[in-house]
Amino acid sequence: MKVIFLKDVKGKGKKGEVKNVPDGYANNFLLKQGLAAEATNSSMKTLEAQKRKEEKDAAAEVENAKELKETLEKLTVEVKAKSGEGGRLFGSITSKQIVDAMQKSHKIKLDKRKFEMDDAIRALGYTNVTVKLHPQVTATVKVHVSEQ
């Protein structure tokens, strides 16, 4: 019997896959548990439409990330901090502080976990920080740390 998997089934198939499985296995387990649906013409058309919609949504997500990247790369985020002699900061600037500064000055809200910083910023001046907006889109934000 041909079935469309509605959920991942270990050793049998992944969600959205169409496979031939034994009739008894399909009727007694997959269909009863709601793990699969019988592959009829209408359900195949529904599956195709769903796949097209998911691809369209994914493409739109990448486009939005690219637009945000262009916006972010034009910006300079100003962060003020207390510093000692030689331009060393008392403490450091973390991704959370950068996100807060962006929210205040540019009204752009990002998740602090998207910032890829090896270490926190510990000196005055300009620093480039990478932001992973999407698995395929990475932006660079210019952060200017000035004395308070």
Curated annotation (Swiss-Prot):
Q: Does the keyword RNA-binding apply?
A: yes
Q: Which domain of life is it from?
A: Bacteria
**InterPro entries in alphabetical order:** Ribosomal_bL9, Ribosomal_bL9/RNase_H1_N, Ribosomal_bL9_bac/chp, Ribosomal_bL9_C, Ribosomal_bL9_C_sf, Ribosomal_bL9_N, Ribosomal_bL9_N_sf
> Can you list the GO cellular component terms from the UniProt entry?
ribonucleoprotein complex; ribosome
GO terms (molecular function) for this protein are: rRNA binding; structural constituent of ribosome
Q: Which UniProt keywords are present, listed alphabetically? A: Ribonucleoprotein, Ribosomal protein, RNA-binding, rRNA-binding
The record's Pfam families line, in alphabetical order, gives:
Ribosomal_L9_C (PF03948), Ribosomal_L9_N (PF01281)
Gene Ontology BP, a term: translation
**What does the record give as the function of this protein?**
Binds to the 23S rRNA.
Question: According to its UniProt record, which protein family does this protein belong to?
Answer: Belongs to the bacterial ribosomal protein bL9 family.
Mind telling me what this protein is named?
Answer: Large ribosomal subunit protein bL9
Species in which this protein is naturally found: Bacillus cereus (strain G9842)
